[in-house]
């Protein structure tokens, strides 16, 4: 057996091979383990011959013992193997590895040493915070002494780096070997691997970055240090470059506070090592794919090697193992693995796929199978043990079987268990439903409240693993209010309200709720009976001392009255609660715990069910949509347990229903912790379902504002608990809400549920709840006259002018009627006393406020996210705090996309922020609305384009607001004021339903001058003038009539889009002109420059004529400020004029001055286009609805004209112009899909590279029709690869047969896979849009489909090359044919060899490969060199394979036939 090469031989080796690797395991030790151990010895500087003796094994164990607790898996395996070999040498009989390790540790007292070392903390040699004993720093005589690393440790580190070649194993090896090391020791480990300079350079860069970050965050104190005080370590000190060993020891053990510099430095090095490992292992696990003939075992080895190098959490790696390992397998293995079911083990996958591989692998496998078969024949089948005696299932006797029984056949009911009838004839109902359970076998499991209180909205963490199984027969009694105090915490002063909150128990009702209680120290099994008033115990189960006082009592029951003894003040322990109460002792058939004990324990009978009085709202999916079918992503153990408990309770309350695999839909579910970090919240990712669900209209368009509430004497705020879960969901829609809770480690199938109520996160829940609650409240309002109810979602504001008693009565009526409808209002969410928290506001009897605003100080780091939050707080505060500005603060965020990007405050923003800090420090209050008083809105200008306004009644502020929106680039204050007043009026109509009287800071004359011409820009109500310091005024105005006697300036400008060059100028009626050349400009900028030139060169009064609507729109609005510097200069020039008349004329209409100036500025810049074919293009578009690119090419129209024709067509403006693109795909790849329209099936095939489509209407979506369409496609176009979804028609045998016959590779798409059928899905949408545009022109859908296909293929141009899909496809096929032909010609050239001479060297060299042949020279390639040789020095011959040696020039000249053949080929090559 090869024992000569191992540490054991003979009988010792036989004993070794009988020892099991694990307790009760099947695998045993083999000789290969000994060979492996011998090789591993070198890593630790030990000789393999030490394994041959007991003393040698003892030395190995002494070396490995300190490293074993923190070592890698390989090190632990070596330690275990040495223990087994030691036991064999010592003739200690052991059965498995675990027993051998225990034997060795007991023999050498290793366990006692560790235990004693743990007890003696003062004598420990390990620094604080560690567990390993392998430390270079030891405590000797209460002083810390450094011991250098041993050569064995350094040798092991070097061998690891050399053997693993910076694999993923290097990082854990470094962690194990450097445990407890100082920075000096870590640098020593890095120095011994000095040959790897590239890796060390990366490590150095990471260490330098971390050291710099340390210095930035740990700045040394200012000034000199006191005498004897230890300085704080810097980044270079931690790295060991500027610190000594003694300083490192002092910082680690004696400093106050202590700084473990060694551990900190190890973290930096580990970060660098991870970066090095990632660089040396560039192949990602996502790129690992199994080859077509690669054995599955080799693929798994490569996959796990790449997985170890991934720097990802373990849960992510688990997910990669579960999904990517199967997803990236080849088709043969993938087909086998899918047949294994959900989440197979790796061992099952390896066994199932062991036959997949190339011929060599299959031959090797066949040899192994044949050898195993021969061994089985030699060994023979194993015999089974003796069979037991036969037993009859009819009479129960031994010796014969049921079919041989002579006794009459007994019929047994499987429902009640009785003999004589069958289950279908049973009249007894459920079997043993009221049977008294034996006391010893019905103990209910303990379930604590702190672990039990899970709900959809929150659950405690962690959940209890000993949960009780649920029942399908009846929902259990659930107690979920409050929390249970610990044993002995209850006091006599506990109030009834406090006692009612302690719930800790859940019992299923599929059997009697029996519970073990302790009465005066005696355990008693009793029935928890919520229908019994008293607690009655049988005399045989409970005995009290004779001297304990009692009194006689008669209690009534179903069978009549019974005499009992009543003992008072008896102590009863139920779960973790101790209750004192009365106990009755008598002849009761069963022990009963009544309500007198259960009520003190805080138990309730909760039946959470959906209300049957609320009608379901019918909901459906969008047309053509289907429900979500998404895979559940991996979850951690604690999340799975939390979700299990949440769903179990919701199922018991009727909010969820358990379903199976028959429901094909699924949505991912996950859990997050609430803010208090003690409870869990379940979240379902309904994004895909929301896309497919019909659209809803939000019936409540906004949040009610407290300024719109009227002042009332009595106010109560209540909240509807579990609002959504009380409203039933449409039964037909429930199947789409299905989700799955996976099992840990995939130990079983997931638990699937679907919602019976409105789920959170679904887009229909808010609308349905709002509408349902509104209908319920309408009925409630009729029963509560004088009570005003304001509702937003589940928050209710109840107010009245009644006295307190009557108001509370009406509130109780509201709560009672809501409860009748299934809407519960918990007591803890009822607010009866001020201040009332409502919708983020604080309501008081006479005022309302918001919570105190605390703005963070300016010092410190500011990111985009932090500033966004501050701006949100300021916007919220601006409804009550006047004067808040955020313009400059928001300006800092422009162009910033990364939320964590740091922001540097500008001076303006900093001043603005400090001003806001001063504003929010003062408390502001708002009043309530009085409908009898006048509503006034006052506006103030704050400067810098920011405005503020207040709504008041008789001087009391209702609310405030601000306005800083600039809608146009060029604007003036009057236009902004008009928009602001419009906003104020909309806000007043929304909150109070009436218009206010608006007070504006503008002069009446100024406003009228502007308003008479521009009244159409907006509508505003009546307003009045208010004298404030910042009055709005017009800085200039334009006259309406031409100024007589003044010169007229015709202005124009032109620019080229290509060169960005332009001209601007003017020409006056009196012959004055000026032309100016411009660079890097546009048409609009040139037009504005011309106006500016005319204003500069004219007098105080001027007439200006332009043909630019852009210029007219800007200047006629009289802007006073602009973001454009050029417009700002024009405004300044206008202010200097006394009168300006501005007129517009159409261009190119032969108008005198306009035509002349247009020719002057257009010369050399642009061409005047004469658009004669516009009408022809319009007619063609009305017929085919082609896109603008097609009209540009066919009719020679400018882009802007062609786009205008498309924009004017109402049928082309549904979703705008689609943008065409091209995906990366081969030329013979097609995608196919079926879509539905008007109740018919349209099958569509798209050529991925060109976008060309084939489509037709088919009778049925079957495999036969799909295969027939595929044959048509194959007859017309080359198809080598077909990609579809995994629908039944595409995966049918008919399609598979056509693919086999046509040699077509067929693949199917997977959700979230890059190879999904995205192209054909996009074409489906485009085809439907074209059909909708031409549907009125066709009688039948079949005709419309063919017409739409023609339009798409031939009339829509764009994408690659700017041509149509049909042109692109033909072009690609032609190009492919040309390339194939050219490749054949190139191949002919490559079949020739060239012998050549260089310079004056007479020796012929070669042969070289011919690349190109011209008239005067040839291009050849010899080895890696490419050379150009004159024709006179080159001889070309045809390569016929092996030939005789040619040693003369004549032999080469003799092959003139080949040269002639090359002449023709070279001509073709020259043309190319």
From Swiss-Prot:
Which segments constitute the Integrase catalytic domain? 1223-1373
Q: Where is the composition biased (Basic and acidic residues)?
A: 483-499, 1454-1463
Tell me the GO molecular function terms: aspartic-type endopeptidase activity; DNA binding; DNA-directed DNA polymerase activity; exoribonuclease H activity; RNA stem-loop binding; RNA-directed DNA polymerase activity; RNA-DNA hybrid ribonuclease activity; structural molecule activity
Entry binding sites for Mg(2+) 1: 719, 794-795
> What is any Pfam family matched here?
RVT_connect
- Chain ranges for the short sequence motif Nuclear export signal as given in the UniProt record: 16-22
Residues that bind Mg(2+) 3 = 1233, 1285
Q: N-myristoyl glycine: lipidated where?
A: 2
The protein's name is: Gag-Pol polyprotein
State the organism named in the record: Simian immunodeficiency virus agm.grivet (isolate AGM gr-1)
Q: What is the lineage of its organism?
A: Viruses, Riboviria, Pararnavirae, Artverviricota, Revtraviricetes
């Amino acid at each position: 057996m090869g024992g000569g090469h191992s540490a054991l031989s003979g009988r010792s080796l036989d004993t070794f091979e009988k020892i099991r690797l694990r307790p009760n395991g099947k695998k045993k030790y083999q000789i290969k383990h000994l060979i492996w151990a011998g090789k591993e010895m070198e890593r630790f500087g030990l000789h393999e011959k030490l394994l041959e003796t007991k003393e040698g094994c003892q030395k190995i164990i002494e070396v490995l013992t300190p490293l074993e607790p923190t070592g890698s898996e390989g090190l632990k395996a070596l330690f275990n193997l040495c223990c087994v070999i030691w036991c064999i040498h010592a003739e200690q009989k052991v059965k498995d590895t675990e027993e051998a390790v225990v034997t060795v540790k007991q023999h050498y007292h290793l366990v006692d040493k560790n235990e004693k070392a743990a007890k003696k903390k003062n004598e420990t040699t390990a620094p604080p915070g560690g567990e390993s004993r392998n430390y270079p720093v030891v405590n000797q005589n209460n002083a810390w002494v450094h011991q250098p690393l041993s050569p064995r440790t350094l040798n092991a580190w070097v061998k690891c780096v050399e053997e693993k070649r910076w694999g993923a194993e290097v990082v854990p090896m470094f962690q194990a070997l450097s445990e407890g090391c100082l920075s000096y020791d870590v640098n020593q480990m890095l120095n011994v691997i000095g040959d790897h300079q590239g890796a060390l350079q990366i490590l150095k860069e990471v260490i330098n970055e971390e050291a710099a970050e340390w210095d930035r965050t740990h700045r040394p104190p200012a000034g000199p240090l006191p005498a004897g005080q230890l300085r704080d370590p810097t980044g270079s000190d931690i790295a060991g470059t500027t610190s000594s060993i003694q300083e490192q020891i002092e910082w680690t053990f004696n400093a106050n506070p202590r700084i473990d510099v060694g551990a900190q430095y190890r973290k930096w090095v580990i970060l660098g090592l991870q970066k090095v490992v990632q660089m040396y292992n560039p192949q990602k696990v996502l790129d690992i794919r199994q080859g077509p003939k690669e054995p599955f075992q080799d693929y798994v080895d490569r996959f796990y090697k790449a997985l170890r190098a991934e720097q990802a959490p373990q849960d992510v790696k688990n997910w990669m193992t579960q999904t990517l390992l199967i997803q990236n397998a080849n088709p043969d293995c993938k087909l086998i693995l899918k047949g294994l079911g959900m989440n197979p083990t790796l061992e099952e996958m390896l066994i199932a796929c062991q036959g997949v591989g190339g011929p060599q692998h299959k031959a090797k496998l066949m040899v192994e199978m044949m050898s195993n078969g021969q061994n089985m024949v030699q060994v023979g089948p194993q015999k089974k043990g003796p069979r037991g005696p036969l037993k009859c299932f009819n009479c129960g006797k031994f010796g014969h079987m049921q079919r041989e029984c002579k006794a009459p056949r007994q019929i047994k009911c499987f429902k009640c268990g009785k003999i004589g009838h069958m289950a279908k004839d049973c009249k007894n109902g459920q079997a043993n439903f009221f049977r008294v359970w034996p006391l010893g076998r019905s103990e209910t499991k303990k379930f604590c409240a702190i672990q039990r209180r899970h709900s959809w909205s929150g659950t405690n963490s962690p959940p209890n693993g000993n949960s009780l199984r649920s029942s399908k027969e009846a929902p259990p009694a659930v107690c979920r209010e409050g929390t249970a105090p610990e044993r002995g915490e209850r006091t006599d002063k506990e109030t009834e309200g406090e006692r009612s909150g302690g719930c800790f128990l859940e019992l299923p009702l599929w059997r009697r709720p029996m519970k073990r209680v302790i009465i005066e120290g005696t355990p008693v099994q009793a029935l928890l009976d919520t229908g019994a008033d008293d607690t009655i115990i049988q005399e045989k189960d409970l005995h009290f001392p004779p001297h304990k006082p009692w009194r006689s009592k008669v209690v009534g029951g179903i069978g009549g009255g019974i005499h009992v003894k009543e003992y008072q003040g008896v102590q009863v322990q139920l779960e973790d609660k101790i209750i004192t109460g009365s106990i009755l002792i008598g002849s009761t058939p069963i022990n009963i715990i009544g309500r007198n004990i259960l009520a003190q324990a805080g138990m309730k009978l909760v039946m959470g069910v959906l209300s049957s009085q609320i009608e379901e709202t019918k909901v459906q999916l969008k047309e053509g949509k289907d429900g979500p079918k998404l895979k559940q992503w991996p979850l951690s153990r604690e999340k799975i347990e939390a979700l299990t408990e949440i769903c179990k309770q919701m199922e018991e309350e009727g909010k969820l229903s358990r379903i199976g695999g028959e429901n094909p839909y699924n949505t991912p579910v996950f859990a997050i912790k609430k803010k208090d970090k003690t409870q869990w919240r379940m979240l379902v990712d309904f994004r895909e379902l929301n896309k497919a669900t019909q659209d809803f209209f939000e019936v409540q368009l906004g949040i009610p504002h407290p300024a719109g509430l009227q002042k009332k004497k009595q106010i109560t705020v209540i909240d509807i608990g579990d609002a959504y879960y009380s409203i039933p969901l449409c039964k037909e829609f429930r199947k789409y809400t299905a989700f799955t809770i996976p099992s840990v480690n995939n130990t079983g199938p997931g638990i699937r549920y679907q919602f019976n109520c409105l789920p959170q996160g679904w887009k229909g829940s808010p609308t349905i709840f709002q509408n349902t609650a509104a209908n319920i409240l309408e009925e409630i309002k009729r029963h509560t006259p004088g009570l005003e109810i304001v509702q937003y979602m589940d928050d209710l504001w109840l107010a009245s002018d009644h006295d307190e008693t009557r108001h509370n009565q009406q509130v109780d009526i509201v709560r009672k009627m809501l409860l009748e409808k299934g809407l519960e209002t918990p007591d803890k969410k009822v607010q009866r006393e001020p201040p009332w928290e409502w919708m983020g506001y604080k309501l008081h009897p006479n005022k309302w406020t918001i919570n105190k605003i605390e703005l963070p100080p300016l010092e410190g780091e500011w990111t985009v996210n932090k500033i966004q939050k501050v701006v949100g707080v300021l916007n919220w505060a601006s409804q009550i705090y006047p004067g808040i500005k955020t313009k400059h603060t928001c300006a800092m965020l422009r162009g910033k996309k990364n939320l964590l990007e740091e922001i540097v405050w500008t001076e303006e923003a900093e001043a603005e922020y400090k001003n806001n800090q001063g504003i929010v420090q003062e408390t502001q209050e708002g009043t309530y609305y009085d409908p009898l008083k006048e509503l006034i809105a006052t506006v103030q200008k704050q400067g810098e384009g920011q405005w503020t306004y207040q709504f008041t009644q008789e001087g009391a502020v209702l609310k405030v607001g601000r306005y800083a929106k600039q809608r146009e680039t060029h604007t003036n204050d009057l236009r902004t004021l008009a928009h602001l007043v419009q906003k104020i009026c909309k806000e007043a109509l929304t909150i109070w339903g009436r218009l206010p009287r608006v007070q504006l800071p503008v002069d009446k004359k100024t406003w009228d001058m502007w308003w008479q011409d521009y009244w159409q820009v907006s509508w505003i109500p009546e307003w009045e003038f208010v004298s404030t310091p910042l009055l709005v005024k017009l800085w200039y105005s334009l006259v309406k009539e031409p100024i007589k006697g003044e010169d007229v300036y015709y202005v124009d400008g032109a620019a080229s889009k290509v060169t960005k060059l332009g001209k601007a100028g003017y020409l006056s009626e009196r012959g004055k002109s000026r032309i100016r050349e411009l660079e890097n400009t546009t048409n609009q900028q040139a037009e504005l420059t011309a106006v500016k030139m005319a204003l500069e060169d004219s007098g105080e009064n001027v007439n200006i004529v332009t043909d630019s609507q852009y210029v007219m729109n800007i200047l006629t609005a009289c802007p006073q400020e602009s973001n454009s510097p050029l417009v700002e200069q024009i405004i300044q020039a206008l202010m200097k004029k006394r009168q300006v008349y501005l007129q517009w004329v159409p261009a190119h209409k032969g108008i005198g001055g306009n035509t002349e100036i247009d020719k002057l500025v257009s010369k050399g810049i642009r061409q005047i286009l004469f658009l004669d074919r516009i009408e022809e293009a319009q007619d063609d578009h009305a017929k085919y609805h082609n896109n603008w690119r097609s009209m540009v090419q066919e009719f020679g129209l400018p882009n802007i004209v062609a786009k205008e024709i498309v924009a004017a067509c109402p049928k082309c403006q549904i979703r705008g112009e689609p943008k065409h693109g091209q995906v990366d795909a081969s030329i013979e790849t097609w995608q196919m899909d079926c879509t539905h329209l008007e109740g018919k099936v349209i099958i569509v095939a798209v050529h991925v590279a060109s976008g060309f489509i084939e489509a037709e209407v088919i009778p049925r979506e079957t495999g036969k029709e799909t295969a027939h369409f595929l044959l048509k496609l194959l007859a017309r176009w080359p198809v080598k690869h077909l990609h579809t979804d995994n629908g039944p028609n595409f995966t049918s045998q008919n399609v598979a047969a056509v693919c086999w016959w046509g040699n077509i590779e067929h693949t199917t798409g997977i959700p979230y896979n890059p190879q999904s059928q995205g192209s054909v899905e996009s074409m489906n949408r485009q085809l439907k849009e074209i059909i909708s545009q031409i549907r009125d022109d066709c009688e039948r859908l079949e005709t419309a489909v063919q017409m739409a296909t023609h339009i798409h293929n031939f009339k829509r141009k764009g994408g690659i090359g700017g041509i149509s899909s049909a042109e692109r496809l033909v072009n690609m096929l032609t190009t492919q044919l040309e390339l194939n032909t050219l490749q054949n010609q190139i191949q002919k050239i490559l079949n020739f060899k060239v012998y050549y001479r260089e310079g004056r060297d007479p020796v012929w060299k070669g042969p070289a490969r011919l690349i190109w042949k011209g008239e005067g020279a040839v291009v050849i390639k010899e080895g890696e060199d490419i050379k150009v040789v004159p024709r006179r020095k080159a001889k070309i011959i045809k390569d016929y394979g092996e030939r005789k040696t040619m040693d003369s020039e004549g032999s080469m000249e003799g092959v003139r036939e080949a040269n002639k053949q090359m002449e023709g080929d070279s001509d073709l090559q020259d043309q190319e």
